[in-house]
Structures are given as structure tokens and as C-alpha cells.
A protein has these predicted regions:
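A short, Lys/Arg-rich alpha-helix, primarily the initiator
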Residues: 1-20
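Residue-level signal for the short linker/turn that defines the boundary of a DNA-recognition helix
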Residues: 12, 22-23, 49-52
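Residues in the recognition helix of alpha-helical DNA-binding motifs
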Residues: 17, 31, 42-45, 71
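Alpha-helical residues within the helix-turn-helix
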Residues: 19, 30, 59
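Short alpha-helical DNA-recognition segment
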Residues: 22-41
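DNA major-groove recognition helix of helix-turn-helix/homeodomain DNA-binding modules
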Residues: 52-67
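Short, charged recognition helix plus adjacent turn
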Residues: 70-92
Length: 92
């Protein structure tokens, strides 16, 4: 899986979990202290989420960040997730 596919999978999982929890974009944006338009751009793929953005979204959704990486069983901690995201971003 290339970088673009991995990022799209992460973004898709963020959106899926948000919807499963019955949270609107506006509600999640408010909880995570983002603008709704920023979150919409992340979910649509127009804006690539940073490490901190992904961690803030995970915290706002009350999930372990590794839930955004379903195909990565080695991701166990926030630090692991942060390192994996950094590795992905370095491929840009």
C-alpha cells in the first residue's frame, strides 16, 4: 500500500468511527477544537492530517489512535502511532 492509499484508509477510518458514534463533523470539530471546515477538508482528503491532528481526533472520539490503523497490529501506543504517522508523512 502506498502513502496515498494509507492516508486515505486512515481518513476513511476516522470518518467511519465518527459516524458509528453518531457524532457530526461540527460536534467532533468542536470537541477537538478544530473548525468544521478544517475537519471536512481532512475527511474529504483535501487536507492531510498531521500527527497532532490524528491524535486530537482520536482523543475527541475517545478511541485508541491505533483504531485508525486496522491493518497495523504492531501499533500499540500513542507514541507508536505518532511514529507511524511521521514515517508516512516523510514519504511525501
Amino acid at each position: 500500500m502506498n502513502f496515498e492509499e494509507e492516508m486515505n484508509a486512515i481518513i476513511g477510518r476516522i470518518r467511519k468511527i465518527r459516524i458509528e458514534k453518531g457524532i457530526s463533523q461540527l460536534e467532533l470539530a468542536n470537541i477537538a477544537n478544530f473548525s468544521q471546515s478544517f475537519l471536512a477538508n481532512v475527511e474529504s482528503g483535501k487536507k492531510k492530517p498531521s500527527v497532532m491532528t490524528i491524535l486530537r481526533i482520536a482523543e475527541a472520539l475517545n478511541v485508541n489512535p491505533r483504531e485508525f490503523f486496522p491493518d497495523s497490529p504492531t501499533v500499540n501506543t500513542k507514541e507508536d502511532v505518532k511514529n507511524q504517522i511521521i514515517n508516512l508523512l516523510e514519504k511525501i
